[in-house]
């Protein structure tokens, strides 16, 4: 199935019907762009996180992990500028009172314009000059001036709500790494270069979330802050671009569905020396940002050092000098990359049986490392349930295993294909034999491959090693 033939509705329907993702708070009418990961979705998303940690922490000679608090001292966000300037350009349609993001209105009507490089005043002027930019709701060109809309969720700590109790849900996980730089370097005795990786929730009060789990107000990030000596940063920037792209390719994303887009100088954040986005060809857009890799220089550590009065310098014993490290940041949205893996894996295969009847097989061709269930154990008859459950219980010590003894074997295969289970293990009467008839058990099972539908006979004792070999990436 070509990428252009896929639609977001196909992905959403599969996710809802098969327990990957449900609308949040659905019995109360839901909550806009709130999604709950169901039984299969939580296993799948956990596997995405495990795959990231495997390559970025476990196998990396440079990186260590961290799990920082979601609610931080509010001075953190004053220092970084989030309190004063982490905002979207908001305007209202005077005719119908609908509220919109100005940059989105400009970008949709004039994609040739680099809206990221425009100030709020420049956006105001551009909209005023271009009457083809109209309200998507009523079609009128009559807007209020742009105003800032801060994206942070504000809350309060303690029993009173005043300015002294104000705090925020973190809008990014990166700052928890920066404020812990000295603690991590001291306790791990790491020398530059080294990185700190974190998986965790972040929150942004987005004006226009949408496209399923692509953009939501509550999301999970997988971020690495890689600290290096100034002057070596661009080499490491290139290293991490390749490393990130290779991770995606190793888990089944096709190279032709990815592109690396370097930011133009006008797009760069003022503190950034270079930024590259790895973009994916989502079915609902031409290209959508998947992974941002940025050279943040020493901006964050310098700001925190100045505001806190605590030294965040690194002593280089080889050169006998003190300096603030530069930082390369590969930042990836877990929910967004999980959606990309689902879009990549979704397939509808048109088949014709021996009688000439046409059929459509829906298959989720997830890499086995990401699949919620690594295998499913299917007894050919319920009379074989005891042996089948014995196999299931043994394999479940090492993998997530499904068990299904309801319906024809063909229908069970199709169910497993649709949820992405890479291998189906069929227990038949040859497996257990028939002592009364003098037929010895062969202690073998039939293993069916999801992608090819090919079947092989295999000893039960070899199942674990066989599946393990397929999970590696």
Predicted regions and their residues:
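NTP/phosphate- and nucleic-acid-binding module
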Residues: 1-473
């Amino acid at each position: 199935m070509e990428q252009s033939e896929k639609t977001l509705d196909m992905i959403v329907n599969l996710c809802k019907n098969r327990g990957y993702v449900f609308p949040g708070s659905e019995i109360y009418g839901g909550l806009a762009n709130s999604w709950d990961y169901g039984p299969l979705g939580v296993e799948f998303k956990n596997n995405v996180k495990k795959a990231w940690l495997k390559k970025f922490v476990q196998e990396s000679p440079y990186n260590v992990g961290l799990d920082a608090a979601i609610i931080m001292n509010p001075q953190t966000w004053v220092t970084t500028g989030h309190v004063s300037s982490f905002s979207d350009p908001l305007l209202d349609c005077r005719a119908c009172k609908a509220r919109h993001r100005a940059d989105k209105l400009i970008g949709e009507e004039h994609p040739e314009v680099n809206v990221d490089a425009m100030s709020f005043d420049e956006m105001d002027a551009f909209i005023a000059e271009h009457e083809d930019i109209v309200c998507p709701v009523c079609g009128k060109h009559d807007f209020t001036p742009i105003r800032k809309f801060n994206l942070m969720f504000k809350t309060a700590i303690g029993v009173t709500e005043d300015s002294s109790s104000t705090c925020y849900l973190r809008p990014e996980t990166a700052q928890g790494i920066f404020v812990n730089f000295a603690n991590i370097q001291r306790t791990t005795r790491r020398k530059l270069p080294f990185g700190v990786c974190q998986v965790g929730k972040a929150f942004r009060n987005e004006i226009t979330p949408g496209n399923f789990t692509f953009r939501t107000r509550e999301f999970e990030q997988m971020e690495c802050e890689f600290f290096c000596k100034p002057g070596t940063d661009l080499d490491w920037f290139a290293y991490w671009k390749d490393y990130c792209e290779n991770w995606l390719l190793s888990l089944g994303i096709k190279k032709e569905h990815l592109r690396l887009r370097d930011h133009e100088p006008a797009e760069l954040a003022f503190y950034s020396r270079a930024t590259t986005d790895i973009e994916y060809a989502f079915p609902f857009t031409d290209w959508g940002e998947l992974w941002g890799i940025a050279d943040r220089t020493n901006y964050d550590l310098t700001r925190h050092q100045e505001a806190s009065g605590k030294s965040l310098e690194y002593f280089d014993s080889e050169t006998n000098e003190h300096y603030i490290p530069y930082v390369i940041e590969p930042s990836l949205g877990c929910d967004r990359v999980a959606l990309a893996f689902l879009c990549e894996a979704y397939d509808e295969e048109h088949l014709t049986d021996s009688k000439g009847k046409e059929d459509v097989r829906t298959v989720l061709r997830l890499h086995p490392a990401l699949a919620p269930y690594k295998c499913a154990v299917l007894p050919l008859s319920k009379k074989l349930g005891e042996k089948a459950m014995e196999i299931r219980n043994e394999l479940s010590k090492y993998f997530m295993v499904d068990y299904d003894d309801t319906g024809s074997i063909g229908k069970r295969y199709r169910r497993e294909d649709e949820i992405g289970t890479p291998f189906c293990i069929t227990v038949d009467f040859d497996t257990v034999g028939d002592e009364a008839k003098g037929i010895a058990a062969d202690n073998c099972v039939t293993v069916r491959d999801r992608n090819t539908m090919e079947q092989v006979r295999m000893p039960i004792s070899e199942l674990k090693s066989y599946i393990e070999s397929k999970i590696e990436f």
